Amino acid sequence: MQLNSNGWHVDDHIVVAVSTGIDSMCLLYQLLNDYKDSYRKLTCLHVNHGVRSASIEEARFLEAYCERHHIDLHIKKLDLSHSLDRNNSIQNEARIKRYEWFDEMMNVLEADVLLTAHHLDDQLETIMYRIFNGKSTRNKLGFDELSKRKGYQIYRPLLAVSKKEIKQFQERYHIPYFEDESNKDNKYIRNDIRNRIIPAIDENNQLKVSHLLKLKQWHDEQYDILQYSAKQFIQEFVKFDEQSKYLEVSRQAFNNLPNSLKMVVLDCLLSKYYELFNISAKTYEEWFKQFSSKKAQFSINLTDKWIIQIAYGKLIIMAKNNGDTYFRVQTIKKPGNYFFNKYRLEIHSNLPKCLFPLTVRTRQSGDTFKLNGRDGYKKVNRLFIDCKVPQWVRDQMPIVLDKQQRIIAVGDLYQQQTIKKWIIISKNGDE
């Protein structure tokens, strides 16, 4: 049984994940024999999921095996009681916790490469699983031989080797292993694919499951193209402020993208900047309908912390409380520099004293101001609409009133002509 050993070098510290099943035990056997000179150091990791009664016996067997072959072994017992109590997916929860521990141990061991025993049949099973459960459009279709993690790499040297070859190899060299009885239980989707669906397809001479590998190659090429296109779009159209986590993108530019690319763009942005994962395709499609509607302004709740705001030509992601905690009323009795929400007010000493005290507040229903250079008044709300001011900005913008409660300034949009030089309002941080 030949391993693909291109994933590590002779001076590497390699770590192999061993379950004591036939696949990982055959991999370990080869690493100790035909490939014993292909690495600098070998360490084993074993996870006891604590779900099966045989887990203790398997761990003891592996301890004795590794001691006999002078291999360092580290064992982790997982607590999956939370998933059992809630009837959650044990397999998915176990995988997440397993790889969290792998990440930790690879860092502690300062190792270079983690080897897993995924083989050709696992690859075909995974491809089929992702097609049938709808997860094929935003993920690669199966395993890559090489995957990158934080600080190390995962390599799968058996990915071109079939289960049949592994069984023949085990029988030839009498390699000890444990059979996980839960692998026969078809209540688990992957087991059902492996035990029932794939054999049924193989019985038909006109069908070949192996053709899925061609589909994977084509699919993954398209996936890479989408990822590249998404990065190009983000680089060109997305503005992001790291401190406030405020993200802005052209609504029209986003709407012009095909839906498949929209999903990839949002996947990239939400996972990178907001640690949001696994938004369903159905949810995305509902958002896209709203984004492409003629409605000028609306909001969508992402979480209890983040919100999507659509404001005229912009698609914005920001903190939900951006418009919740701000000044409502402030009194200014003398010239100076003042701050109101996200605005800076410079009140000059030349401002007539008869106008003091000034009142600074946010908008109120029915607010009007005197037009400059002509008779008549205009509603503040109409000014906001004409200037396409987003709703949450309207709720924060300072409106300045004189002693007689007449509006003499509306944010950075309007100042009464007679005092224009003496009240300067700018967004905090603007030059």
From Swiss-Prot:
Key words of the record: ATP-binding, Cytoplasm, Ligase, Nucleotide-binding, tRNA processing
Tagged with keyword Transmembrane helix: no
- Gene3D superfamilies under this entry? HUPs
Q: Which GO terms describe its biological process?
A: tRNA modification
Q: Where in the cell is it found?
A: Cytoplasm
Alphabetical GO CC annotations of the entry are: cytoplasm
Q: What class of enzyme is it?
A: ligase
SUPFAM superfamilies referenced in this protein's UniProt entry, alphabetically:
Adenine nucleotide alpha hydrolases-like (SSF52402), PheT/TilS domain (SSF56037)
- Which EC number(s) are documented for this chain? 6.3.4.19
Its function, per the record, reads:
Ligates lysine onto the cytidine present at position 34 of the AUA codon-specific tRNA(Ile) that contains the anticodon CAU, in an ATP-dependent manner. Cytidine is converted to lysidine, thus changing the amino acid specificity of the tRNA from methionine to isoleucine.
Q: What is known of its domains?
A: The N-terminal region contains the highly conserved SGGXDS motif, predicted to be a P-loop motif involved in ATP binding.
Matching NCBIfam families: lysidine_TilS_C, lysidine_TilS_N
Name recorded for this polypeptide: tRNA(Ile)-lysidine synthase
The protein's gene is named tilS
